[in-house]
C-alpha cells in the first residue's frame, strides 16, 4: 500500500514541469500582458520572452545591471 504513495509522489515530481508549457506567451494579448512588444527581431536591449505569431517575436526591454565587486 505504501508503494502507491511513493509512485504518486514520483509521478507528481516527474510531470510537474509540463504544467509550465501551458503558460507560454503565444499571442499579442499575452505578450502585452507580460509587458512586451511584438517585433520582428529583438535587437539592442530587448530580449525574447515568447512569440506573437510565426513572424513576430515578443520582446521585452531590459536594462543591464551594473556588476559590482564584493569586497
UniProtKB/Swiss-Prot annotation:
Family matches, as InterPro entries: Defensin_beta-like
Keyword hit for Disulfide bond: yes
Compartment(s) of residence: Secreted
Alphabetical list of Pfam families matching this protein: Defensin_beta
Chain residues in the propeptide: 23-25
One of the protein's GO biological processes: defense response to bacterium
Chain positions with Pyrrolidone carboxylic acid modification: 23
Alphabetic keyword roster: Antibiotic, Antimicrobial, Defensin, Disulfide bond, Pyrrolidone carboxylic acid, Secreted, Signal
Gene3D superfamilies named in the record: Antimicrobial Peptide, Beta-defensin 2, Chain A
SUPFAM superfamilies: Defensin-like
GO CC field: extracellular region
SS bonds (residue pairs): 31-58, 38-52, 42-59
Segment forming the signal sequence: 1-22
Family: Belongs to the beta-defensin family. LAP/TAP subfamily.
Task performed by this protein: Has bactericidal activity.
The protein, known as: Beta-defensin 7
Organism: Mus musculus (Mouse)
